[in-house]
């Protein structure tokens, strides 16, 4: 029975989780998943060039212009 009051006090000391987000999103916030999707799409477009030589990565970059 001694443990019950200690347990209740510990429960009261634990902060509860906020029901809403603490920080509001701004227009500059971009989900990280969309950033990775854009990077993958760009790399895929660079590698899908017909005249791109796999041995030389730099030749792919010159064809993007």
From Swiss-Prot:
Domain of life: Eukaryota
Signal sequence extent: 1-19
Family note: Belongs to the conotoxin T superfamily.
Single annotated GO MF: toxin activity
Post-translational modification note: Contains 2 disulfide bonds that can be either 'C1-C3, C2-C4' or 'C1-C4, C2-C3', since these disulfide connectivities have been observed for conotoxins with cysteine framework V (for examples, see AC P0DQQ7 and AC P81755).
Pro-peptide positions on chain: 20-48
GO cellular component, one term: extracellular region
Cellular compartments annotated: Secreted
Major localization listed first in the record, in broad terms: secreted
Species this chain originates from: Conus litteratus (Lettered cone)
Tissue expression from the record: Expressed by the venom duct.
Name of this chain's protein: Conotoxin Lt5.1
């Amino acid at each position: 029975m001694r443990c019950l009051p200690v347990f209740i006090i510990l429960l009261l000391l634990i902060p509860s989780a906020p029901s809403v987000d603490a920080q509001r999103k701004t227009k500059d916030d971009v989900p990280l998943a969309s950033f990775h999707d854009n990077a993958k799409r760009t790399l895929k477009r660079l590698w899908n060039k017909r005249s791109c030589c796999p041995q030389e990565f730099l030749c792919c970059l010159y064809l993007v212009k």
